[in-house]
Amino acid sequence: MKDKYLTVTALTKYVKRKMDSDPHLRDIWLRGEISNFKHHSRGHMYLTIKDDSARIQAVMFASSNRKLLFHPENGMNVLIRGEISVFEAYGQYQLYIHEMEPDGIGSLYQAFEQLKERLHKQGYFADEYKKPIPRYPKNIAVITSPTGAAIRDILTTMKRRYPSVKITVFPVLVQGNQAKASIARSIQQADSLSYDVIIVGRGGGSIEELWSFNEEEVARAIFESKTPIISAVGHETDTTISDFVADLRAPTPTAAGELAVPSQVELLDKIEIQKRQLARLLKQYISQHETILHQLRQTYAFKYPHQLVKQKEQELDSTMDNLQRRMKSKVSDDKLTHNHLIKRLSSQHPQRELRLAIDKLRQLHSLQNKMMNNYLEQQSQRLYSQIDKLSLVNPLEIMKRGYALPYNEDGALIKSVKHLHINDTIQLRIADGEVTGKVTAIKEANENGNEGSNV
């Protein structure tokens, strides 16, 4: 009986074989909405495809999703082609997606809008990064297909308008899987060679044929270029990501040639106009100054130069006399000022000030000595007075008047007869020595200080 029971693994493998062998499940075309989208670090995409009533788990491996031209997002309606199989580890069926595109909008357009929005947020289209196109370029790089009509239009236009310009063509692929790398690499190479301007473009075509100029790799190369870049992709109605990133957008390759260089004919016309303007201004200048010269010739100075010289000589003599008088007066005034300053300096001579300072210092020194002597005298008298006061209470001075201090055998001062006994040995310290004796009698004084009874 036990042999009738299957393991979970065996059952799951059986169901998987059944589903894998069903031709209807091997090629599924499915419409639904994306939810729970997750792009794993290994490159695989995990998501749920749902409608109003049901949902199914799905996975799109990196080998398939790297071909997508748009970035899947939650809430996006998509058209899917894939197959149904069982994920054995969880025992659940899921959809393995091989192809996917937006539902209701082309995948290329979806990819274009997504990249456009992302680069716009990153500042790729900002005017602050746009570089000016030089007015008179000497060296121009053209990055395009060497065989298309675009290169002929660009070269013909520039050589016709500005024959002196030097043009270098960088041949690239402009469509196909390898085109974006070819274009980006040539932009970087041309930028490193210090051209004045770079033209990047191609002739018209479908959106698929122009798609290389909508790739992020090409947009990044244009944005990072230090050389000004003119984008010239397709016709006037065609708009690519490269047009938004470039420093200047030309509606056609022919227009790119016109925008890149000035017209030599127009320059020559401007030069001719400026020459005529300069000649006219020069003629006016000469005419004006001839009039001024004629007016000067009619003045008194030109008509009567000798009289004018004599008049000026008299004015000069008068001026010289006035100058001499003023100089003498100035010298006299300066002399008086000088004498006055000498007197002031003499009264304020440093030696005089020094003598006054020395006299004042001597006076201060004498006053200081006098005050110090007075202070010492006062302190000496105060000291002697304190010594006299101390002498009055000095025990030695008291003993000189006939008093003595008694001590017992232990050297302690005897202050009362109560501390003595008959036959005690005592020492009497007098002014000029000591006396040893024995107690033979003890009399205690009464309250009046008179002798009392024997103890």
Curated annotation (Swiss-Prot):
Q: Which Pfam families match?
A: Exonuc_VII_L, tRNA_anti_2
Q: Which UniProt keywords apply?
A: Cytoplasm, Exonuclease, Hydrolase, Nuclease
Biological processes per GO annotation:
DNA catabolic process
InterPro entries for the chain: Exonuc_VII_L, Exonuc_VII_lsu_C, OB-fold_nuc-bd_dom
Catalytic activity annotation? Exonucleolytic cleavage in either 5'- to 3'- or 3'- to 5'-direction to yield nucleoside 5'-phosphates
Do the record's keywords include Cell wall biogenesis/degradation? no
Question: Which stretches are annotated as coiled coil?
Answer: none
**Enzyme Commission number:** 3.1.11.6
A GO molecular-function annotation: nucleic acid binding
GO cellular component, as recorded: cytoplasm; exodeoxyribonuclease VII complex
Instruction: Report which superkingdom the organism of origin falls in.
Output: Bacteria
Q: Where does it live in the cell?
A: Cytoplasm
Hey, what's the signal peptide range on this chain?
A: none
The task this protein performs is described as: Bidirectionally degrades single-stranded DNA into large acid-insoluble oligonucleotides, which are then degraded further into small acid-soluble oligonucleotides.
Subunit info here reads: Heterooligomer composed of large and small subunits.
Q: Which family does it belong to?
A: Belongs to the XseA family.
Q: What is this protein called?
A: Exodeoxyribonuclease 7 large subunit
Q: Which organism is it from?
A: Oceanobacillus iheyensis (strain DSM 14371 / CIP 107618 / JCM 11309 / KCTC 3954 / HTE831)
